[in-house]
Amino acid sequence: KFFLYTGRGPSGHTHIGHLVPWVFAKWLQDKFKTKMYFQLTDDEKFWSKKDMTLEKTSKFALENALDFIALGFKPENTKIIIDTKNIKTLYPIAAQFAKRINFSNTKAVFGFENETNIGMIFYTSLQSAPCFIEDMPVLIPFGVDQDPHFRITRDVAPKINKPKPALIHNIMIPALGGPKGKMSASNENETIYTTDSPEVVKKKINKYAFSGGQPDIEEHRKKGGNPDIDVSFQYLRIFFEPDDKKLQQIHDDYKSGKMLTGELKEILIEKINKFLAIHQQKREDARSQLDEFLFKD
C-alpha cells in the first residue's frame, strides 16, 4: 500500500509540459486506487524569483490547481496542499528534516552562495514534508529537474525512521525552439499554455516550433526529415499521439520525405487544439470544485 505525491511551483500559467507528470499520476492513481497529494510551492517561487510577490504566486497557485483538477482527479482521494496555507501540517515534518540537513550539503547540491536567502536554503525540507504526510510509503512521479530535492529526501528519510520515497522521473517536453531545452512558463514564444486559443497555438507552432526538415521542399523530398530533433514530432511522441502505429507511420513518412514539415505541424496543431478545447472547459468547471480539493489542516 502506498500513496502518490507530485506538485508544481506556481510562478506562472500552466503549460503543456507541466501536464505530463500529472497525467501519469492520474493513471497511477486509477490503476492502484491510491490517495494523491498535490503540492503547490508558492513559498519557493516567492523566495527564488526576485520580482515575485506572495500575492502573485498565491494567485498562480489557485490557477494552476484548476489545470490539475481538470485532468479528472476526484476530491475524495486527492488533496491539494498550498505551502503558505497549510504550513501548520507541513512545518512539524519539515522541522524534523531541517535538523538533519546541513548547509554544506545543500550548498553542494544546489550551488547556494552567501547571497542566497535562507528561505531557499530551508526549502528542501518543505518539499520533503508531503512525502511523510501519510504513514505509508510514497511514490513520486515528477520532472527530472526536481531530482536533487528528492535525493536529499531519500538520504534523510531513514534518519527519522521513515521509508525512502520511490521516484519516477518523467520526460521533459522540449521548448518550441529546440529539443535541448525544456518548456518554460517564462518564455511565451516557446511555450504552449493550457489557456492558449486555437489561433495562438497555430501561430506558435508554425512560427516557433523547431523543424527537423530540410531547407526546401525539393531537398526534403530527397533527403527526408529528422524526427529525432523535430519538436512537432517530439510533442506527438511524448503526449499527443497515443496510437503507436500512427506515430510510427508519421515518423517513417517524415523521415522518408513523404511528409513535409508543414504537414507535420498541421497534425500537431489539430491535436493540441482538440485537447485544449476539452481541457479548457474542464478547467472552468473545476472552479466550482476547487474548495473540495484544498487540504484542510
Go through the PLM ranges and name each one:
Residues 1-4, 10-129, 280-284:
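N-terminal Rossmann-like or analogous alpha/beta NTP/dinucleotide-binding catalytic cores
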Residues 4, 9, 135, 169-173, ...:
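A residue-level detector for conformationally permissive "hinge/kink" positions
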Residues 5-9, 142-143, 201-204:
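A generic short-segment signal for beta-strand/edge and adjacent turn/coil regions
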Residues 5-10, 137-139, 250-254:
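Glycine- and acidic
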Residues 11-14, 18, 139-146, 221-225:
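Short, charged/polar micro-motifs that form catalytic or ligand-binding hotspots
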Residues 33, 133-139, 240-249:
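Short helix-capping/linker segments at secondary-structure and domain boundaries
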Residues 78-191, 201, 230:
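Positively charged, phosphate-engaging catalytic surfaces used for nucleic-acid and nucleotide handling
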Residues 147-148, 154-297:
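Conserved nucleotide- and phosphate/pyrophosphate-binding catalytic cores
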